[in-house]
UniProtKB/Swiss-Prot annotation:
InterPro entries: NAA25_NatB_aux_su, TPR-like_helical_dom_sf. Its main location: other. One of its GO terms (cellular component) is lysosome. TPR repeats lie at residues 45-78, 79-112, 523-560. Keywords: Antimicrobial, Immunity, Innate immunity, Lysosome, Repeat, TPR repeat. The lineage of its organism: Eukaryota, Metazoa, Ecdysozoa, Arthropoda, Hexapoda. PANTHER family: N-ALPHA-ACETYLTRANSFERASE 25, NATB AUXILIARY SUBUNIT (PTHR22767:SF3), N-TERMINAL ACETYLTRANSFERASE-RELATED (PTHR22767). This is Phagocyte signaling-impaired protein. The keyword Nucleotide-binding does not apply. Component of the N-terminal acetyltransferase B (NatB) complex. Belongs to the MDM20/NAA25 family. The keyword Iron does not apply. Residues 856-880 are annotated as: Disordered.
Length: 962
């Protein structure tokens, strides 16, 4: 035994250099060290596994796979080798192989606690709850620990609520009932030990809607002993479900006495008061209804009067009570006072805080438009700043800002004439500059300027004017103002978000990309806020620039997927049952994120559009994508909308904003766009697969000749193509019948239109439908092939003419307004080139295949002559010639597009710089450089786009010219 221990220590010392090199990222050195060690000890499994890891990190995937497979086949049992193999399989996302590893190891060592624990966690990663339960019970029998017992309990719970049988109510009931009995057995035996175990029991009871039992356990001695820190919200929830409103009311009064600024408690308290009103009146309690609300008012007033420092909570609660009483047609003014006076009082106390606007906005929908505007005027008077005066201090400035924001929310700016709006804009600029110079000195780089909201409001006003006049000059001026603010207040993300939005509206991808990078969006924000940029990149005119942004986003999702699995595993290791469902739901939301699925799909389309090498290299790139045309991998009914649409602050009129409807409409349209793009990619993939099928896993023949694709596989590819083609035309028919409306663009903060209407307007449907027929005819040699070649050729001409015509229109618009329709024009050009680029790649694949086939001479048998009535298939040689003719035609059309793009003029600003500088009224030394820099960004963005599009066309011309 001592000798064995000495050998283990010796091997660990020899493995140390490999581990050290892998840890610092020196993978090549790690590979050399592992090979050096294996020359001396060729049977050392851990060294072989480390070699496989080094190869994996060097990108030598096939060698790595072979090395790891050889080690796995030896069925190792030592912890070091198993850990290295597990790490490799996690990197490769082959989680089932980790399960197999530990299954073999456990068979050799059935009672090994550590191996069983690893096997359990491996089942956790693949969400096999039934297997989890079995292994957990094995563990408990081997080592009777509470943790293992409750692993089996939670596994039973998850079988009931998340497993494959969870949709069957009877099965769900059986599993949850079993889990409850398992815990109760432990309780009877006096083995319940921790607060997480108590939480799990409560959770099981609530899942079965046994709320009375849950309440009794929560308020019992055992729970008080094990779970003294049970969240109060758990009591709220149970009391509400059980209808114990009086008890809830008393509990909330106690809590509010202790913590007087809890707005969430106040809302629950007021709700309990109104629920008490609905209870049947008992004998001797005829004044109960009146008492309930008057007691509520007295309680709130008592908190206000007795508080040393003024806190928002009770004042907001009083407004909430007033609002609810009016909704129930109760005499609110008589009991509490005039609503306007309450709001003005709240404003006078708390308007020096930026949250005041949002607070007051909560209660505006409950009053009429006339009352809202009257209230807005009262608040402007209360701020103490008139049209002829400036704020005297920072607090007064914040009050004025709050009053202006509420005024806009009340609709005060909607009906103003344009000259009044322009005067208002000028006043806002003046207030911004005054506030910046007076109260914004010596700010830290991380602080926002106190007067920045004036500029944000000004940008919204200028958008209103631009929309009325259908001109870009006012909005361009707003963009320049925002860039000026950003120079003074580098951390104001509201300014960055609005600037990003305006750059996208004007089709300036370079400016948008700079703002997006300036926002420094990281981690989960790539999912919740990435939509502000990534969803606007497809068909923006810069395929490689878009691809880089997709890479950043997808890298987060890929890395976080592995991290999320480990977080879930850790919740089991530490028995944190209260967090398990939260982590599992979080994992599912990210896995099914619309942002992730869209970026992944558009990245694949970008790669196919941008292919520039020879046909065999391009086919290798295509093969790596692993597109399965017959399989729709998107879980459409589980797609998750994780966008944070409140990230961009807004003060638009409340009666004209329906945020929920806007979210739903945009999400529905984005899903339809995703369906179109996904189906287009799968349909296109069938074109390629029909002529270059995916590699067959069977070994190649001994004589070295290529193995031909079996006839059933060809028939399957053909039927898949026909099926997807029908789905393609059917989807377009359905979308036209759905008659989706473009997203409203009434305000600056509204989401930009989706690509749905653009994709319906452009000839995508006809182009790919006719292309599908051409591919089928080329494959079968149908007699109608020549006619379909002409039809496809006509489509190519139409797409080329669309591209040229759009560029000509853009140049004409430059004489009027070069920015207002710029984004739409760029999208049409990019879409045209996308279709032509995909067509060029397909023709190169067809030509390569047909050239090889046409050289193979087929000898006819003597009895194989057919009658003249039977149409003969077009010969391989003729098909090859037809494809080459299509390539020649495409080459000329691509050259025509290139010539048109050469003439595409950069956007011209609608007015000269001196006119803009006169309107900006900012510091003279700043104005020239500021507006010049913004103008240069537009020019550089156009030049980058033209260069990239021309390079794309040159690659495609080279591709079809070979």
């Amino acid at each position: 035994m001592a000798h064995q221990g000495m050998d283990t220590a010796l091997f660990e010392r020899r493995l140390r250099p490999i581990y050290d090199n892998l840890e610092v990222g020196n993978n090549r050195k790690a590979l050399q060290e592992s090979e050096k060690l294996l020359r001396k000890h060729p049977s050392m499994l851990c060294a072989r596994a480390l070699k496989g890891l080094a190869l994996l990190r060097l990108g030598r995937y096939e060698e790595s796979h072979g090395c790891l497979q050889a080690v796995a086949e030896d069925k190792p049992t030592d912890d070091s080798t198993l850990q290295v193999l597990s790490f490799c399989y996690r990197e490769m996302e082959q989680l089932n192989k980790i399960v197999e590893l530990y299954q073999h190891a456990v068979k050799k060592n059935p009672g090994n606690e550590e191996l069983l624990a690893h096997l359990f966690i491996s089942y956790v990663r693949v969400e096999d709850y039934k297997a989890q339960q079995a292994v957990a019970l094995q563990l408990y029998k081997a080592q009777p620990k509470n943790a293992y017992y409750f692993w089996s309990v939670i596994s039973v719970v998850f079988q009931g609520i998340r497993g494959p049988e969870s949709a069957v109510p009877e099965k769900r009931k059986i599993y949850l009932g079993l889990a409850q009995r398992m815990v109760e057995k432990h309780i009877r035996e006096g083995k319940l030990e921790s607060e997480q175990e108590a939480f799990l029991y409560l959770h099981i009871l609530k899942l079965q809607k046994k709320f009375q039992e849950a309440w009794e356990f929560l308020t019992g001695e055992l729970c008080a002993k094990l779970y003294p820190g049970a969240p109060v919200s758990m009591k709220f929830e149970l009391l509400k479900v059980l209808g114990n409103w009086r008890e809830l009311n008393e509990l909330l009064q106690q809590l509010l006495d202790a913590d007087r600024d809890r707005w969430d408690y106040y809302k629950e308290y007021i709700q309990s008061c109104f629920e008490i009103l609905k209870l049947p009146i008992t004998e001797g309690a005829t004044e109960e209804k009146k008492f309930s609300l008057s007691a509520c008012q007295e309680f709130l007033q008592g908190i206000i009067d007795s508080s040393e420092r003024k806190k928002r909570g009770p004042y907001l609660a009083r407004l909430e009570l007033h609002q609810r009483m009016r909704a129930h047609q109760l005499p609110a003014d008589q009991l509490i006072g005039d609503f306007d006076e309450l709001v003005v009082e709240y404003f006078s106390l708390f308007a020096d805080k930026s949250c005041c606007t949002h607070d007051i906005a909560l209660f505006l929908p409950s009053v009429s438009m006339k009352q809202r505007q009257a209230l807005a005027n009262k608040l402007l008077l209360e701020s103490g700043v008139s049209s002829t005066s400036l704020p005297m201090n920072k607090e007064q400035m914040q009050k004025h800002i709050c009053a202006l924001q509420i005024s806009r929310m009340c609709g005060a700016h909607i009906d103003l004439p344009i000259d009044h709006l322009l005067a208002f804009y000028t006043a806002l600029k003046l207030h911004y500059e005054h506030g910046r110079s007076t109260f914004g000195n010596k700010l830290l780089s991380t602080e926002m300027g106190p007067s920045d909201p004036y500029a944000l409001l000004a940008a919204n006003v200028m958008y209103d004017i631009s929309l009325r006049e259908n001109k870009s000059d006012y909005l361009f001026e707003a963009l320049c103002l925002l860039q000026y603010v950003l120079r003074n207040s580098t951390s104001n993300f509201h300014v960055k978000l609005l600037s990003l939005k305006i750059y996208h509206m004007f089709g300036c991808l370079l400016g948008a990309q700079e703002m997006y990078e300036y926002l420094d969006i990281k981690q989960i924000q790539l999912d919740s806020m990435g939509y502000v940029h990534c969803q606007l990149l497809p068909l923006c005119g810069r395929f490689s620039g878009a691809r880089n942004s997709y890479d950043t986003t997808m890298k987060f999702f890929t890395n976080s997927y592995k991290e999320r699995l480990e977080y879930i595993a850790l919740t089991y290791r530490f028995c944190t049952f209260s967090k398990m469902e939260e982590f599992l739901n979080f994992k599912e939301r990210l896995t099914n994120s619309l942002q992730y699925v869209t970026c992944s799909l558009e990245a694949q389309i970008c790669d196919l559009v941008s292919c520039y090498a020879n046909v065999h290299q391009n086919l290798s790139t295509y093969t790596v994508m692993s597109i399965e045309p017959a399989e729709d991998r998107i879980a459409w009914h589980e797609l998750s909308d994780n966008r944070d649409l409140d990230a961009i602050i807004r003060w638009d009129p409340l009666h004209q904003v329906d945020a929920d409807a806007e979210r739903k409409d945009s999400f529905d349209q984005e899903i339809e766009v995703l369906q179109l793009r996904s189906l287009m990619l799968r349909l296109y993939a069938t074109f390629i697969d029909l002529y270059h099928p995916p590699p067959i896993t069977k070994p190649s023949l001994s004589d070295g000749s290529k193995e031909e694709t079996p006839a059933p596989a060809v028939e399957s590819a053909t039927s898949t193509l026909e099926l997807l083609r029908d789905s393609w035309t059917g989807l377009y028919q359905r979308l036209r019948l759905m008659n989706y409306k473009p997203l409203p663009q009434q305000f600056l903060v509204n989401l930009l239109p989706t690509r749905l209407h653009l994709l319906l307007e452009l000839p995508y449907e006809r182009f790919f439908d006719d292309l599908a027929q051409l591919v089928l005819d080329l494959h079968s040699g149908a007699a109608s092939l020549a006619a379909h070649c002409k039809k496809v050729g006509d489509n190519v001409i139409a797409v080329m003419e669309l591209c040229v015509r759009t560029i000509e229109e853009s140049n004409e618009w430059n004489n009027k307004d070069g920015l207002w329709k710029r984004r739409y024009q760029q999208q049409k050009v990019a879409a045209s080139l996308e279709m032509l680029s995909l067509y060029a790649f397909l023709l190169s694949v067809l030509n390569d295949k047909l050239q090889v086939s046409s050289k193979t001479k087929v000898k006819k048998k003597q009895g194989d002559n057919k009658t003249q009535d039977t149409p003969q298939p077009v010969s391989e040689k003729e098909r090859s010639q037809m494809v080459q003719e299509l390539m020649r035609q495409l080459k000329h059309k691509l050259e025509a597009c290139d010539a048109a793009i050469r003439t595409w003029k950069a956007p011209v600003l609608p007015r000269d710089l001196s006119s803009f500088m006169a309107d900006m009224s900012l510091k003279p030394e700043v104005e020239a450089t500021l507006i010049g820099d913004v103008s240069a960004t537009f020019k550089d963005s156009h030049e980058l786009m033209v260069t990239e599009l021309r390079n794309l066309l040159k690659d495609k011309i080279r591709m079809v010219a070979k």
